[in-house]
């Protein structure tokens, strides 16, 4: 935390925009917001969509939800009123921003339709920012919140706010590849600041963007607070190997690969059970797959778990499995390592920045259930290896993925942008 002599200036106010806030699978955004607030930054949270009430699980979630401005579902009077105010008080700016939105996307009419939706969402956020005196919008993820944040700032600039309105975004994992290279390069050029959570992500943005914009692309790891480094897991020396997977149940997370690996382990007589924590569109297909593989008695689908309880699940496990097909540096992997668990993870994108194979965990080729099963079997046959990996992984997270370190980097970067605005 910043000392009294290092207080942020009164201009250190900004909007934080995410698709959902709070979000069960993106609890790291909540941690980041609270860490920045503790460092004298005034953060106002905005979300494109309301959070599913079933995913508001803790008191912190409820507080975050109640204080967040949400666009959808729209409050009709406020939604229409924002557009009428923007159109009637600045028709040229409104139409120029709409034209900008419709002229830039790839994907033909389908892409333009999405940009129209983003424009419709951006105007109420601009109006709320105007009411609150906010002129900088930071988006988590390049799309869709990145598109909307860009349009919010664009509308502010078109209305005469050049030099005052600006925007920035954080790029994480697969979101880097959801935009076309030209679209993402344009976002990097338009933004005042770009935060990447991994060196891999930064390298990909540098590959797409012109060199004159590289300086604004910085790395600030997501991180964990000190509570995560207390009372770690104690892997057992015998009995069924208790495997844990945590995350959204979506195709890119690779849970189907993990189920195939469990089937292979069962065929080889390796005693292992799996708990899957999380929710998503693949829940029912994964349950059907488990039944078809004959491993339903070895797999438990727990559903969503709040941050106030998730640590109990890490502490009850012996090995953490992350079979993703693409990731930045997953926070669930940090949580597992901070809990002292040995991890088996896919060797893809930013993951090797956290997992050094054979040192802080085991890396396997993504999409290959045989490789995943072999790594798990190795840990089942050598529990002492798991304990060594768990200790080393825990040290890695403590030393390099501490929330305070990342928050200080973000604070410094935001203050540079905001002080530049104030000087104009």
Model-predicted regions and their roles:
Residues 188, 304-305, 312-317:
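Short alpha-helical donor nucleotide-sugar binding micro-motif in glycosyltransferases
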Residues 200, 223:
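Carbohydrate-associated surface elements
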Residues 235-253, 259-262, 275:
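Conserved donor-binding/catalytic core segment of Leloir-type glycosyltransferases
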Residues 287-305:
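Nucleotide-activated donor-binding/catalytic signature segment of Leloir-type glycosyltransferases, i.e.
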Residues 298, 371, 378, 385-400, ...:
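A short, well-ordered alpha-helix in the C-terminal region of glycosyltransferases
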Residues 325:
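Aromatic "clamp/platform" in nucleotide-sugar-dependent glycosyltransferases that forms part
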Residues 342-345:
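Short hydrophobic beta-strand element within catalytic cores of glycosyltransferases
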Residues 357-358, 362-369, 378-383:
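Conserved acidic donor-binding segment of nucleotide-sugar-dependent glycosyltransferases
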